[in-house]
Amino acid sequence: MLQPKRTKFRKQQKGRNRGQALRGSQIDFGEYGLKAIGRGRITARQIEAARRAMTRHIKRGGKIWIRIFPDKPITQKPLEVRQGKGKGGVEFWAANIQPGRVLYEMEGVPEGVARRAFELAAAKLPIKTVFVTRAIM
């Protein structure tokens, strides 16, 4: 599972997820990409589940790049605990995603295989995505 090795602070405030993706909106490494058109939060488990789905579909051919990293700690209080007594413990790590962000890239496989692999990956993710190629961008 992806998570930072160390952070300056253990917990973060919730924050707001507004605007378009300023960085990471171009295909930099591969030929094909999976681009977010919705906004939301993707957990480390979802990133890994999508990666596994793609890897299983393309078998041994091709290369995959993960362009997002879960660097935001999400805290949660235990069940049936009253409010107060401080912030809960870190439950999982997530990445804030804005529209326009490239989530995954792939090369070394035919376009049909890449398209199907990204469809399988998109089914594991909580936000709407679209298939993009380097030529279109």
From Swiss-Prot:
Pfam family, one: Ribosomal_L16
GO biological process, one term: translation
Top-level lineage group: Bacteria
Keywords of this entry: Ribonucleoprotein, Ribosomal protein, RNA-binding, rRNA-binding, tRNA-binding
Listed GO CC annotations: cytosolic large ribosomal subunit
Disordered, as annotated region: 1-21
GO function term, MF aspect, one: rRNA binding
Amino acid composition bias (Basic residues), ranges on this chain: 1-17
InterPro entries in alphabetical order: Ribosomal_uL16, Ribosomal_uL16_bact-type, Ribosomal_uL16_CS, Ribosomal_uL16_dom, Ribosomal_uL16_sf
Family: Belongs to the universal ribosomal protein uL16 family.
Quaternary structure, from the entry: Part of the 50S ribosomal subunit.
HAMAP family xref list: Ribosomal_uL16 (MF_01342)
Summary of the function given for this chain in its UniProt record: Binds 23S rRNA and is also seen to make contacts with the A and possibly P site tRNAs.
Protein name, UniProt field: Large ribosomal subunit protein uL16
Species annotation: Nitrosococcus oceani (strain ATCC 19707 / BCRC 17464 / JCM 30415 / NCIMB 11848 / C-107)
Name of encoding gene: rplP
